[in-house]
Every structure is written in C-alpha cells, then in structure tokens.
C-alpha cells in the first residue's frame, strides 16, 4: 500500500518534469525498489538529482531511445540523454528478446544517465521468465 502511494507521488513529480507517464512509472519503480532492498543511495535520495539534471537539460525528459540491431543476439541502445532507468529498461527488454531467440542477449547502452541499482535489472521479473 505504501509503495503504491509512494509510486504515485514519485511518478507525478517526474511527470511534472516532463517525463511521459510510462517513463515516469519505470523510473519510480526503480527508485522504490532501491529503497525496499536497502540501497538507499540509489533510491529516493537521488530524486532531487534527477529533477535537477532535467531542469539543467543534462537529462532529456522527452528522449527518443534508439535500438540498433548488430546481430540476432547483440544490440546497442542509444539513450539520447534519457533518464537512465528508461534506457536500462529498454536494454534489458531487448536483451531478453534476443536471448529468447538465440540463447544469448548482449546489449550495450550509451548516452544515458545514472540508472540506479544495477541488481534491479538483473533480478527483474522479465529476466526470470527467460
């Protein structure tokens, strides 16, 4: 219950800073996860930093993330200076898709900001389905 209310608050803050609802939701989930696992340095304490970076145009809140297929197993994600959570989410989804087809998925990310707790992506629900 608390985390759903907290998610709504964080999501609304990110939306105020011009992130799409989807990108705000992805970002809020990652911040809350960091708090729930005790990695506070990657959680809510960073919210102001992300908002400041958006205000200073270091993070592009309207970034169009591009995925370049290198092979059936390998891809590059260009985050276009997006908030890192969204680029990382795109990367893990791309890696999973590639792995389902070929048995391995390797994705590199560039032009992206801080993406929080890396273990969040390694332990994602999507990855557990592979």
Task: Map each language-model feature to its residues.
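Short polybasic/polar patches that bind polyanions
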Residues: 15, 100, 126
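Generic N-terminal amphipathic, Lys/Arg-enriched alpha-helix
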Residues: 1-17
